[in-house]
Amino acid sequence: MRKIELLAKSHDRDGFDCGSEPLNLFLKQTARQHATRGISRTFVLVEGGASESKPIMGFFSLNLCQLKSESLSAEEAKKLPRDVSGIRLGRLAVAREYQRQGIGKTLLVAAMGKFIEIFNTAGGIGLFVDAKDQEAKHYYEQFGFVSLPSNELELFLPVRTIQEALAQNS
């Protein structure tokens, strides 16, 4: 059984390869440091069970973010105060051997679930992501993310869209 877990020492970070060296290096060298410093949290998808070193199928990281509402669409901005909070999906990657098997969607749905946990405690207007390129942008758009007017590679998924998506997946 597959499980989403908070990144821990028991996870095999060194064996992870998604094909993108910056993402590999983040997981291997930076993710746990960011967690210790309170910068972000990284979650991994692993096969369940009690093994010594759990291979990582994929991961995502989340951090808090704040932005000016004017960076959103005019329709969204008019309903909000000047400064708004959300959650940033900092990174999302799938190990090469698991790519094109729906793992990215599994990770994204898990990130949405984590967003809702935070939303229920502290609020937030949605999930933000900086797509690394046009291909990544199109991937996120499949799930309802929309580009911000100020930067087409910065995308936003409103809380109501997340709630609807999770209701359909349950």
Where are these regions (language model features)?
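Non-catalytic substrate-recognition and accessory regions of acyl/acetyltransferase enzymes
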Residues: 1-101, 105-170
